[in-house]
Amino acid sequence: MVLKIQRPSTGKKMTVKVQRKAIQMPYLPYYGMQKDGIGYINYNQYLENSAKDVRRAFIDLKKQGMKGLVLDLRNNGGGSVQEALQILNMFIPKGRHLLSMKGKVKNANSNYNTTVEPLDTVMPIVVLVNEATASASEITSGTLQDYDRAVIMGTRTYGKGLVQIPNVSLPYNGKLKLTTAKYYIPSGRCIQALRYKHTDNGYVAENVPDSLTHEFRTAAGRIVRDGGGIKPDIEVKPDSLPNIAFYLSRVDTTDIMLNYEIDYIAAHPTVASPKDFELSDADYEQFKQRVVKSGFTYDQVSEKILKELESLARFEGYYDDAKPEFEALRQKLKHNIAKDLDYPYNKQKIKELIAADLMAAYYFEKGSLENSLRNDKQFAEAARLLGNPTEYQKLLQPKKEK
């Protein structure tokens, strides 16, 4: 394949020959040692043979003096159950029950135990999860929770507790995803969040209400519940993305942020390492001026709420009396892009987004992930917890009943 390329920064035209071939993306986008002996492994998909890379990464980090591990399963939608079982074999003693699959017919039933001696049964572990952590990731995090082998931190997981056969061929090029069983982790719970109810209009999916969930116990006696995914031992919500940052990075069709980043790369052949890189205030000021001059606008949540309030006031008959106040508030909330970009929280989050993009360009996904840990609230809390052994161990013990 021959590509013709023109560099925006120089206007130079080039011809590049590209050889097409199958590319194997890394199973682990990034792993490495962080401050104070904390190891970090980012695992984004349970692909075939990926557990071997997790194993190698863990061994490497231990050789570097790791004192505690953060296993990041955020946004990991799962994959091969066998890979999940191999990872659990690394941390749970041989002969322990890991997983049961139960279907409506006997040949859909199966049980899985650990089959080899573990690599480590004492290393403190924090598993980071979120609402996009699903399937095999939930088997891993839920089983580690059931054996009190790790502290689960973040937000509640997706809740996919079904065993499915994908891509069953049907006539006329049809495909079917067939559910054959549910899976149950060691405490006996199924973490499936949706139940399917038969109605006159067919099957309807609905969330399992908390009142219908059941209580189970971990190996140490801690209370856990089924339904609704894996509830973390410590809930830590991520920082929210400001509206202006969302529009600049994901909605803006003029690509102001992307074009700024392209120009930045052209002007900076080399930059600091991902662990140290931060967009300077001077560089951010250049970006801000570019945004202001472009005429960029975005929808403010406060303006939307004001319109809804005005509509409600009209409906209730109060609008005419309050009209001057509404108009004054509208003027107060009027767009001031420069002011919005200078607001400290907005500025910080936009700088982080630009830095992550730049690190991906200079150092690929590995660099972007390493840089993002600098401002990752959930990772920071995980590292803090691993640095406090007494607090960590207390979380893995059952609460004293009053």
PLM region descriptions:
Residues 38, 64, 105, 123, ...:
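Short, intrinsically disordered/low-complexity patches at protein termini
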